[in-house]
Amino acid sequence: MKSLEILIFLGPPGSGKGTQAEILTDKLNFTHLSIGDLLRENIINNTDLGKLASNFVKSGELVPDELIIDLMDSYITELKNESNVSGIILDGFPRTINQATSLENKIKQLNVVIKAVLNLDIEDKEILNRLAGRGREDDKPELIKNRLKVYRNQTEPLLEFYKERSLLDTINGDQSETDVSNAIFNVLKAEVV
């Protein structure tokens, strides 16, 4: 049975998680799972999950844990069974302690290991500048502040959760895209590559 490696990206909205995950996907031949992209896809396709998630996304709130956990469990299990997948980069999951605990329980059932948790730390001013130019539905100015508040209250506690497990590495996300990538590769050299 093959071992599957997971990298987790944490950081506030606009910190560059998706950008850096895509760069790593190409370099490491990992699969990128963005919970935000999966939710937007379900909303656009008007699936049952999309209908349930839509109001939460539009208000800048987190989608309830049970919906997210079920969605991610199915994707991780599916990818685990694909022979050409050596690793998964999780972007936007977990976002709560409950989701992180569920992920731990899931990977115990499978031959899966979390290799690193990368926190992209970035100043709020830079976040506002970046998000203002993206043009996504959930990047409207009135929602950005709420999304940051939700992040601080519900997702930031994960930093301590993963620090206690000796998995957390914090990267300065205020740097250029290339400098952030280089910092990530330096952290991962000993852990994944």
Label for each model-derived stretch:
Residues 1-193:
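Glycine-rich phosphate-binding loop of ATP-dependent small-molecule kinases
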